[in-house]
Each structure stands twice: as structure tokens, then as C-alpha cells.
Curated annotation (Swiss-Prot):
It catalyses: XMP + L-glutamine + ATP + H2O = GMP + L-glutamate + AMP + diphosphate + 2 H(+). InterPro entries: Class_I_gatase-like, GATASE, GMP_synth_C, GMP_synth_GATase, GMP_synthase, GMPS_ATP_PPase_dom, Rossmann-like_a/b/a_fold. PROSITE patterns: GATASE_TYPE_1, GMPS_ATP_PPASE. Catalyzes the synthesis of GMP from XMP. This is GMP synthase [glutamine-hydrolyzing]. Its EC number is 6.3.5.2. One of its GO terms (cellular component) is cytosol. Pathway: Purine metabolism; GMP biosynthesis; GMP from XMP (L-Gln route): step 1/1. ATP binds at residues 232-238. One of its GO terms (molecular function) is ATP binding. Homodimer.
Amino acid sequence: MSTVAIVDFGSQVTQLIARRVRELGVYSEVFPPSTDFQAMASRGIKIDAFILSGGPNSVQQLHGVPNAVSDVLNLNLQKGVPVLGICYGFQMLAHYFGADVAQSVAREFGRAWLDVIEPSSITEGVWSLGSKVDVWMSHSDSIVGEVPQGFRVVARSADTGAVAFMCNDERKIYGVQFHPEVAHTPGGREMLDNFLKIAGCTRDWTMGSFLHTQIGAIKSATDGGRVVAAISGGVDSSVASVLVHKAIGERLVCVFVDTGLLRKGEASVVRDLFVGKLNMHVNVLDKSALFMQRLAGVQDPEVKRKIIGETFIEVFEQEAKSLGDIKFLMQGTIYPDVIESGVGESGTKIKSHHNVGGLPEIMNLSLVEPLRHLFKDEVRLLGKELGLPSAILDRHPFPGPGLAVRIMGEVTAERVELLREIDNIYIDMMRDSGLYDHIWQAFAVLVPVRTVGVMGDGRTYGYVCALRAVTSSDGMTADCFPFGETDERKLEFLAFLQKVSRAIVSNLQGVNRVVYDMTSKPPATIEWE
């Protein structure tokens, strides 16, 4: 199986490069700039192509070249491994080979136009010689003067004349100032496809091949040891647990912790799904009192996540001891969790996830995270490959910390119960209306702000609740629903929201105002905390 290594210099869209390559049938993995690729090669680990990502820094600030870049270009020289640099990666290549890179007089952000002045195997079938093409730019630095020796210019900015695409055909090194991985660059997917053809990559990465590889990896990693699985009933932990069960069978022990922060009737739903449909035994632990006690008086969302993560691990360590010789803890961590938590060296932390940033530094169980490098849509595809029912795979994402991060401010028993009922009304009505399967994720948020209202002849003073519904494919970007729908569809959804608002206010004491969150991701995250 071919592998493309992506060196991550901190771009918030690095994961999109990985997704695009995988969509083209080639396995890709993201590595930090400190990676020793020469050592990997000496151990027989074969990389078929390298992509250097964009990033927020400037090559003018560099004190020497990152180890990974030196390794990549040495492997290119020694073994002919093709290299593609994108944005900062392009500037890094130019800098490495001796070109001057400096801050641009005119920076380019967003849509930009290029003049195509030379042909290239990367743009074959995509751009025509002499044409003007639009791309997506996001950069402050540019090459000043000539491109490095051995390189030629394929395209320049129509506005500034700056080099936008250079290549060294003999060494199969390509640098683009724009972002071919984003949807805003027409033909970007085809350019990446051409790069993979140049690298001679085989198109054999599928969920079937991933499943086969992971089963072997799980068997090897656990080495006959027993694993306790943290399941929630959500898509990620369900797929992960079924995958691990397929690999090691009864050595997997599934544990469901009722934190008191879950959706209405969640424990019963989990029992029905795992025992009734998957024939897997589940130990249910009611730890709601413990979690509520630990969260008392806490308002900061990062502190809440940290407390929940630490308490989860504590509970599982205790359960592992009671079960006997348990050495591993399985979690349903997926790639967006890792990216948003800023675990990589160059990434910017957005918020911690209890599966990642919420973990204590010292833990007595080794982690098994079989989905760590998969995006949400890939997890669902893997679930289908494993034969999981749609009742599991079609569920909307639910955060590990549960309702605690959908209650702004302090978490109290009263607020949890109120939000649980609000959310249940919203989701039940969404299912009844036929909207549920058209929406990536929908939920309610309780805002600790009280507003004045009137019901009957009396004054009310209740909480505000916010409703959210978004469309997405992988959770990395999202639009509020019904963005992009027809005007008729938008009016229908507005009428639906009015019905939900009336149902919430009429049936629940404590809420007298309902609002709808119209924000996309970015600039917001999907969850409020």
C-alpha cells in the first residue's frame, strides 16, 4: 500500500490535504517537522511521496531548516521520492534551495488570479498554457527575484507578478503558493491526483484495507492483554469497540459510564444497541453523583473538560482493577479531536477534547485509539464495513463531556435536567419532521442568562436556550442549516423552529426564550464550549 507523508507546519487546513489524498485512494498520514524520515527509511518504512503543508510562520524566522525538510529532500535526491510544497511549504523549498523569500508588498488572501506561463505535469488536463486561472491564496511572503537554480516558473500572480508555481522536473519537486486542497481552488483535486500519478502511488487504500491493517495492529499492540473500552453509544466509540472486539474478541470489556450528563434514556439505548444488536456485553456504571460533585462551582469550559477527562480515567482505572488484569483503555478518539486539541507540534490549540487534551499526564492504563487517524465520515464508512446498524451510524455526534459543555457556566442538577428535556423535545421533533437525517449535528444549549417573559397574565423570568443545527462532512468545517437550501426549504425550517420553540416554552418551566445559532465553523466551533 502506498503512503503519502504530510509534514505539518501548523496550517489549520493540513487535515484537508490528508482527506483529499485519501479520497483519491492513497493512504496519507500527518507528521510533525521533527520527524526523522531518514531513520524511518532505514527501518524499511517506505514513503512514496511527501507534501509540505502551509503554516502561520515565516521562513525569515528560521534558524536552520527543520529536520524533516532536510530528510525529505535527501530522500528525494537519493531515492527520487516526489515532493510537493504548499504555501509555507512552497516558501520552505524556495528558501532551502537558495531563493530569497521576503514579506510581500501586496499580500494575497482569498481568491486570486494566476497567469499560466509554462506547462507542468501537475497541471496537465487542468490548466491551459497562456490561460488565466483562479485559485485560493493565503500568504504574506513571496519569492523575491529568481526561482532557485534548476527550477522553472509555471505560473505567476496576475496582480503582483509573484511566483505562484515552480517546479524542478528532473527531481520531481513542485511548489505552489496557493492551496490545491481547498474546494475554493478549481482543479485542485485533479492537481493532487496528477501528483500521486507522478509518484506512482497505488490506489488501494479503502476502508476494507484499513480494517485489515488495524485488526493486525490492534492484536500486535495489545499483545494478548485485556482491554477495557470506554463506550458512549455514539458513532465513534461504537465503531471503535466493534473493531477492537473483532480483533481480540472476549479480551475486550465494554464499560458504559453514566455521568449524569447524557441524553435522555441514553443508558437504555446503549444496552439495546450493544446487547440487542451487536451481542456484546456491557458493564453499566452509574457515576452521576461523582461527576456532579467534581463539577460543582466550575464555570470555565477548559476546566470542566479537564475534570471530566480525569474523572473518566479514574473511574476506568478503578474498573480495570476490579476486573483483574486490564492493561489497556480503548477510546473513540478521531482525527478532528486530535487536530482541535493542538496535540501536534505546530498546531494551534482550539479547545481540548476529553479524549485528548483532557487526559491526565500520568495514567496507569495504556491507550488504544484505533480511529485516531480517521475523519468522522471515514468512521461511518468503517462502521458500514463492520456491519454496524444504521441505528448507531446515523446518530448525531455527541461530545464526550456530554451536556456539561452545552451548559454555559456552572453545571447543576437542575440545569442538566432542564437541558436534557429541551434537547429531547428538539431532537424528537426533528426526527418526526424528517429533518434528522439531513443534518450533521443538532443540539440545544442552555445559556445561564435569564430574561423577562409573560405567560398568561403572569411575568416569567427564565433561562435562554439556543438551538443549533449544522451540515458538515467531517466536522472540521460546518455551515448552519439550512444554508445552501432553497428559499422554500428555509421557510419550512423556520416554521419548524417556531414549533419547537413553542413546545419547549409551553412544556418546560424555567425557559421563556429560544434562539437559533446561525454561525458557521469557522469562525465558531460546532459546540459552544
